[in-house]
């Protein structure tokens, strides 16, 4: 009996102890559950504070990134209206019309029944439509004159000149003309045209430097020059002309060694370079 009572008492004491420990564990669990949200909030606030501190402690060397605009937006600009003073200005005038280019073919000309004659004339003269028209107009303007062509020996210098088919030649005996055998006829500057070779021409002057003695750099031939007696014209060497346009030549001696006296005595030489 005593043993059964003591064992029952021991069971009761064990139950009481387990109940006490369970009761004490329950409040602890509830307390832990109650503390969990606060701990979470504490960790969140700590992380937010850390991020803020990192933002504050960001080194100043790092510049904020600029927002790039697209190329189209850059071209279009901010879209602001033009200033009022520019808005009041009239629009620029339209560009002038393109001038008509010279015709190079007879098909662009209204020649009517003269077309065949015109084309035959072009072929014989070996000219373009513009060149043929120029030749006919020059012939009309320089009535009684013919077009002579000529140049130096090597062909680097070429020219054309309108003059009579019957040439009046001067044979000067001044120091330089005697040395270079300068026989020439005189024409106004407007009737002379250098076709090519300006870069191949060199000029020699002396004394008064009014006479411009021009020579070809390549072959040394003087085919024309500017005489002292006629600074507004040209002296053309007849022996440098192409064959076929000279009908006759008359030669007159000019006493260039006594130039002032010869100029006073000659009544027409100055007028030979005038129109």
From Swiss-Prot:
Subcellular localization, as worded in the UniProt entry: Chromosome, Centromere, Kinetochore; Nucleus; Cytoplasm, Cytoskeleton, Spindle
Protein name per its UniProtKB record: Centromere protein V
Region (Disordered): 1-109
Keywords: Cell cycle, Cell division, Centromere, Chromosome, Cytoplasm, Cytoskeleton, Kinetochore, Metal-binding, Methylation, Mitosis, Nucleus, Phosphoprotein, Zinc
Family: Belongs to the Gfa family.
Stretches with biased composition (Low complexity): 1-10, 17-51
Transmembrane segments: none
PTM-bearing positions, type Omega-N-methylarginine: 43
Keyword Transferase: no
Cofactor binding mode and count: Binds 2 Zn(2+) ions per subunit.
One CC-aspect GO term: kinetochore
Residue ranges, compositional bias (Pro residues): 79-100
PANTHER family membership: CENTROMERE PROTEIN V
Residues bearing the modification Phosphoserine: 18, 21, 257
One Gene Ontology biological process: pericentric heterochromatin formation
Binding site for Zn(2+) 2: 172, 174, 177
Residues annotated to bind Zn(2+) 1: 152, 154, 216, 219
Molecular function in Gene Ontology: carbon-sulfur lyase activity; metal ion binding
Cofactor: Zn(2+)
């Amino acid at each position: 009996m005593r043993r059964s009572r003591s064992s029952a008492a021991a069971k009761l004491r064990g139950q009481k102890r387990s109940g006490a420990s369970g009761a004490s564990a329950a409040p602890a669990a509830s307390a832990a559950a109650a503390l969990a949200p606060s701990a979470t909030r504490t960790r969140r606030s700590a992380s937010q504070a850390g991020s803020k501190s990192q933002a504050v402690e960001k080194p100043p060397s790092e510049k904020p990134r600029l927002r790039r605009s697209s190329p189209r937006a850059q071209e279009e600009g901010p879209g602001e209206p033009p200033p009022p003073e520019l808005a009041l200005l009239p629009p620029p005038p339209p560009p002038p019309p393109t001038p008509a280019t010279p015709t190079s073919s007879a098909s662009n000309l209204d020649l009517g029944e003269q077309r065949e004659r015109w084309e035959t004339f072009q072929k014989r003269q070996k000219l373009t439509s513009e060149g043929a028209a120029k030749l006919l107009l020059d012939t009309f303007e320089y009535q009684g004159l013919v077009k002579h062509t000529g140049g130096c020996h090597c062909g680097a210098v070429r020219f054309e000149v309108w003059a009579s088919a019957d040439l009046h030649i001067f044979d000067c005996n001044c120091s330089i003309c005697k040395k270079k055998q300068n026989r020439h006829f005189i024409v106004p500057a407007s009737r002379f045209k250098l076709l090519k070779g300006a870069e191949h021409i060199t000029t020699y002057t002396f004394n008064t430097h009014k006479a411009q003695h021009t020579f070809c750099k390549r072959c040394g031939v003087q085919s024309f020059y500017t005489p002292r007696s006629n600074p507004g014209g040209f002296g053309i060497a007849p022996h440098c002309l192409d064959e076929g346009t000279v009908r006759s030549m008359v030669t007159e001696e000019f006493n260039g060694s006594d130039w002032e006296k010869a100029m006073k005595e000659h009544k027409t030489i100055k007028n030979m370079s005038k129109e």
